[in-house]
């Protein structure tokens, strides 16, 4: 990768973001980090090679060789090794429960034997695996046993003193920690490699059931004497069988110590699963443990993310490399396995009603049609801007499911509503005529529980727009503080208390509701899904930080600046349902305000055409200019841009099929104070006005197209059913499963959807 040889402080080669320090040693620091491409948390052991002597350097590379060799569910996995001129970075699996020493210290008299048996059996299982590979650990102690609470496992770590051995041959290096080292190591004699690990296992078991080390005196000299004499006292509460096993392991003579086979077959360890981790396959020992479908989907995702091409990925896996390619592959693969196993556990333990709720609120761990992913990413090149992790994160919701909330919180990500489906468009209302009384437009989200409350207020709404979500795997809808209007929309099931905490929310808001579209709308949704497929990128909450970075740069190039992170470009401004095009765009390249001539302002006349008829006179795809002769109209245009951008963020598309030169401006200036929105003074948005017979298209910011050419084929059918969609002045639009209602009233003082009068505005509460 291009960034692989750049600086390693803060961000390792653009692959990992370093965070807080988890621990320190003589030559190394262990830091919490986040893998940028996948978002997974890892532990990074940073070793300063400038402080190492020749012997320590040898131990360092021996540790790396041994950790590459041992891959077991009860051993912390090594994902990647990054070697620089001055530092060595070991990318390791991150435990979530601390080490065993701290856990033991919380129990003065030790753990109950059933729990101690469970943990000790896992440690024995891991050491037995190492010895079968002729690897000796030589530094077994509770500090080097890490808890993985979510998996219910303990795992060995820190192979800094490990080494390969040959059966029958002795080792000579004295290493380890005093309180846990076998007598023969402390004496400096040659020793049998497996026997020293057996001694350390005895010390660990003693600590588990007694709460303190067997050999720990006031000073090292006294401790050494106790070890050499093998003097220790087992408390009376320890069972006879457990005491016998401890005695079998803590033997002064290595030849008299129990072997690992004898330990595994000891009566005290009977009836316990030696390794529950074998049920999880996490960490993934080999890519061959994955199905062909999972394997291919991960490779495809890495290729789309510019990690490497397919041949390079396969070659790295087959040769057991420990580079950024294999690290990314296994982090993605393990997430798939973890999500699948958690889902299986929830399915077995949950009631039918809970299962239904989980299905509604979760994402699938994989997909069966890789073509969906390709359509997803090619629809919006913004996902590929500058950083390699963006496309993989955008595909994350499709392949791996929703990320855990803890991850999202740690990254401090702001999520926007996920809308998987084609860009939205509107069908004009059947009738929209000016009125004389001063009224306000109410923008609200409806729910059945609060309809009665809404009815109590005498309001004459000239039209009502119902926006409907299309079914999708991304059915989580969360609030966003930075979007001034859209932050009133929140997820089904979210508490009202949390919702009320936002001080900037308007008083008249209610929750989302589920309802069924009219037959015409259902027919329309079917045709859109059949002809166009998915148009948005299905980016997940995981994409907010990195993807927003690239999008802000794109917005800057287009002449716009905002105080919030934008969503995918597919959620751009709108076109009409009838013509399939009609998307808003900046007024000019420099972001200045276009001014229309008086003849333009007065041309055409008349009221907006109805959804089923009308006589539009403008050319298909023509963008009309909205400006007035005074400074107040420029201010109104700027305010209109604020609201349009807010609507843009949730893929709310407002299109209009109007007569000749009818003006269509939205002005929220007098209704809400958008303190969080900052639009350049000369920036304005022009709404698209298209004829009913053609599929005019106007590019949005960045020039991205959201509608396929074949949308024009459905125009006739859509025109035929418009009268049904517009029945009772309700305009129904497909969103994704949920319904948003926009009630619009015209304010003659401000103007609303006015025909030939000065530029009109609508008021949003």
From Swiss-Prot:
SUPFAM superfamilies hit by this protein: Protein kinase-like (PK-like)
Domain UBA: 291-334
Tissue specificity of this protein: Expressed in hematopoietic progenitor cells and leukemic cell lines. Weakly expressed in the testis.
Cited Pfam families: Pkinase (PF00069)
Primary location group: nucleus
Keywords: ATP-binding, Kinase, Magnesium, Metal-binding, Methylation, Nucleotide-binding, Nucleus, Phosphoprotein, Serine/threonine-protein kinase, Transferase
Sites where the protein binds ATP: 22-30, 45
Annotated function: May play a role in hematopoietic cell proliferation or differentiation. Potential mediator of neuronal apoptosis.
Protein name as annotated: SNF-related serine/threonine-protein kinase
Source species: Homo sapiens
């Amino acid at each position: 990768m291009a960034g692989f040889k750049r600086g390693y402080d803060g961000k390792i080669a653009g692959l990992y973001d370093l965070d807080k320090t988890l621990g320190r040693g003589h030559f190394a620091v262990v830091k919490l980090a986040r893998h940028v491409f996948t978002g997974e948390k890892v532990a990074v052991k940073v070793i300063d090679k400038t402080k190492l002597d020749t012997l320590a350097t040898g131990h360092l590379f021996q540790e790396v060789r041994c950790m590459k060799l041992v891959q077991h569910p009860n051993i912390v996995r090594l994902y990647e090794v990054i070697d620089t001129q001055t530092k060595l970075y070991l990318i390791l699996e991150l435990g979530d429960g601390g080490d065993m020493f701290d856990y033991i210290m919380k129990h003065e008299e030790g753990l109950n034997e059933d729990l101690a048996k469970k943990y000790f059996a896992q440690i024995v299982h891991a050491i037995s695996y190492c010895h079968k590979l002729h690897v000796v650990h030589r530094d077994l102690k509770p500090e080097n046993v890490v808890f993985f609470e979510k998996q219910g496992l303990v795992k060995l770590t820190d192979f800094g003193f490990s080494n390969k051995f040959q059966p029958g041959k002795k080792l000579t290096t004295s290493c380890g920690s005093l309180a846990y080292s076998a007598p023969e190591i402390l004496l400096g004699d040659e020793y049998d490699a497996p026997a020293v690990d057996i001694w350390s296992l005895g010390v660990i078991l003693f600590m588990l059931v007694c709460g303190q080390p067997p050999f720990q005196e006031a000073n090292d000299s006294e401790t050494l004497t106790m070890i050499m004499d093998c003097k220790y006292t087992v408390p009376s509460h320890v069972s006879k069988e457990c005491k016998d096993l401890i005695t079998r392991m803590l033997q002064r003579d290595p030849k008299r110590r129990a072997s690992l086979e004898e330990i595994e077959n000891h009566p005290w360890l009977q009836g316990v699963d030696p390794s529950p981790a074998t049920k999880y396959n996490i960490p993934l020992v080999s890519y061959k443990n994955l199905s062909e479908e999972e394997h291919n989907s991960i490779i495809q995702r890495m290729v789309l993310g510019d990690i490497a091409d397919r041949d390079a990925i396969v070659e790295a896996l087959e040769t057991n490399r420990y580079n950024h390619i294999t690290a990314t592959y296994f982090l993605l693969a393990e997430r798939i396995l973890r999500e699948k196993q958690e889902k299986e556990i929830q399915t077995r333990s949950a009631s039918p009603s809970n299962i239904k709720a989980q299905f509604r609120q979760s994402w699938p761990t994989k997909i069966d049609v890789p073509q969906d992913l390709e359509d997803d990413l090619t629809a919006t090149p913004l996902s590929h801007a500058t950083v390699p992790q963006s496309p993989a994160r955008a595909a994350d919701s499709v392949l791996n499911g929703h990320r855990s909330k803890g991850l999202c919180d740690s990254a401090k990500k702001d999520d926007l509503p996920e809308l998987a489906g084609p860009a939205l468009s509107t069908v004009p209302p059947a009738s929209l005529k000016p009125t004389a009384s001063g009224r306000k437009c109410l923008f609200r989200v409806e729910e059945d529980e609060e309809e009665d409350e809404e009815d109590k207020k005498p309001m004459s709404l000239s039209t009502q727009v119902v926006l409907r979500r299309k079914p999708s795997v991304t059915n989580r809808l969360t609030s966003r503080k930075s979007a001034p209007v859209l932050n009133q929309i929140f997820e089904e099931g979210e508490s009202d208390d949390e919702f009320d905490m936002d001080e900037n929310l308007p008083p008249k808001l209610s929750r989302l509701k589920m309802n069924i579209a009219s037959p015409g709308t259902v027919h329309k949704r079917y045709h859109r899904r059949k002809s166009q497929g998915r148009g948005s990128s299905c980016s997940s909450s995981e994409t907010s930080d990195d993807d927003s970075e690239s999008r802000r740069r794109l917005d800057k190039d287009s002449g716009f600046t905002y105080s919030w992170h934008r969503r995918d470009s597919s959620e751009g401004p709108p076109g009409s349902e009838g013509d399939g095009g009609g998307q808003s765009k900046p007024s000019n390249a420099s972001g200045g305000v276009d001014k229309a001539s008086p003849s333009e302002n007065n041309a055409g006349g008349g009221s907006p055409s109805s959804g089923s008829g009308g006589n539009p006179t403008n050319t298909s795809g023509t963008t009309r200019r909205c400006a007035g002769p005074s400074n107040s109209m420029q201010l109104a245009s700027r305010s209109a841009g604020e609201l349009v951008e807010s609507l843009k963020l949730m893929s709310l598309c407002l299109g209009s099929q109007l007569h000749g030169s009818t003006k269509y401006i939205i002005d929220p200036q007098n209704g809400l104070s958008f303190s969080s929105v900052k639009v350049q003074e000369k920036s304005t948005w022009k709404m698209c006005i298209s004829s009913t017979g053609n599929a005019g298209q106007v590019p949005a910011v960045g020039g991205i197209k959201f509608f396929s050419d074949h949308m024009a084929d459905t125009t006739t059918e859509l025109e035929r059913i418009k009268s049904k969609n517009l029945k009772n002045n309700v305009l129904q639009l497909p969103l994704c499963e949920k319904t948003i209602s926009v009630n619009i009233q015209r304010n003659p003082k401000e103007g609303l959807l006015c025909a030939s009068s000065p530029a009109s505005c609508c008021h949003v509460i």
